[in-house]
From Swiss-Prot:
This is PF03932 family protein CutC. It comes from Mesorhizobium japonicum (strain LMG 29417 / CECT 9101 / MAFF 303099). One of its GO terms (molecular function) is copper ion binding. Keywords: Cytoplasm. One of its GO terms (cellular component) is cytoplasm. SUPFAM superfamilies: CutC-like. InterPro entries: CutC-like, CutC-like_dom_sf. Belongs to the CutC family. Its main location: cytoplasm. Pfam families: CutC (PF03932). It comes from the Bacteria. It is found in: Cytoplasm.
């Protein structure tokens, strides 16, 4: 499939990207009217790299562009050399598979953008769309971090304005939109929902917005071994599946574009 950047079509702004976990999430988001999808695994960790099988399923079944998370683990964004090499390999493999875009972010220990690694990863991506994820929100100087990403030729940055929610981050989001101009796209995120997405759009001028409308659904497992868990102490978590809520996605998109 030849992927078209939605901003070059008749898409009604703001463009809406839905963050999903796995192929079922992608299918739910596109059915709800998403303009684009961010494809991840393990959203409980903030999103990590999905499996090869998931990516191939997305290539087979997606009808909207999707950008693939490249993040080898949860936690911070200061990666070892071996972790970084795995990211380079993932980006190259995703480029060769023909995905529309990739999402990654690397920081230095002092809270600045790791321009060397970000530049190399962006170069490895070749023609793919490149987004810096919310590693940006962990930088010490957002204005300088934005300029660093522009120098690295990154196409967009995902940010909540360095706060837990876009509502709290409104002033910085508006400043970043002004600073960015037409040099880089600011992709706003952070607790966006049916009640606040129109306000955030109006007060910031964001052309692109990102959210994950999720719901927990009980597992259909009938037998449950109460004596063992697969990690962590919350055994109930292992019998809850987090899914993209298609009606909520559709309603929130409608509110954003009203």
């Amino acid at each position: 499939m030849d992927w078209i950047d939605p901003l070059t079509t008749e898409t009604r702004l703001p463009l809406i990207e839905i963050c999903v976990e796995g192929i079922d999430g992608l299918l739910a988001a596109q059915a709800a009217g998403a303009d684009r999808v961010e494809l991840c695994a393990s959203l409980v960790e903030g999103g990590i790299t999905p499996s090869l099988g998931t990516v191939r399923a997305a290539l087979d079944q997606a009808t909207v562009p999707f950008h693939v998370m490249v993040r080898p683990r949860g936690g911070d964004f200061l990666y070892s050399e071996t972790e970084y090499r795995s990211m380079l390999a993932d980006v190259a493999a995703l480029r060769d598979l023909g995905v529309p875009g990739v999402v990654f972010g690397c920081l230095n220990a002092d809270g600045t953008i790791d321009e060397k690694r970000m530049g190399e990863l962006t170069e490895a991506a070749g023609p793919l769309n490149v987004t810096c994820h919310r590693a940006f929100d962990m930088t010490r100087d957002p204005a300088e971090a934005l300029e660093a990403l522009i120098r690295c030729k990154v196409g967009r940055v995902l940010t909540s304005g360095q706060r837990d929610s876009a509502i709290e981050g409104l002033p910085l989001l508006a400043d970043l939109v002004r600073q960015a101009g037409d040099r880089i796209i600011i992709l706003g995120c952070g607790g966006l929902d049916l009640a606040n997405i129109a306000e955030v759009r109006r007060k910031t001028g964001l052309a692109e917005m990102h959210f994950a409308a999720l719901k927990d659904v009980p597992s259909t497992m009938r037998y449950r071994n109460p004596k063992v868990g697969m990690g962590g102490s919350d055994l109930d978590r292992e019998y809850r599946n987090t899914l993209t809520d298609t009606p909520l996605v559709a309603a929130t998109i409608a509110a954003a574009k009203a």
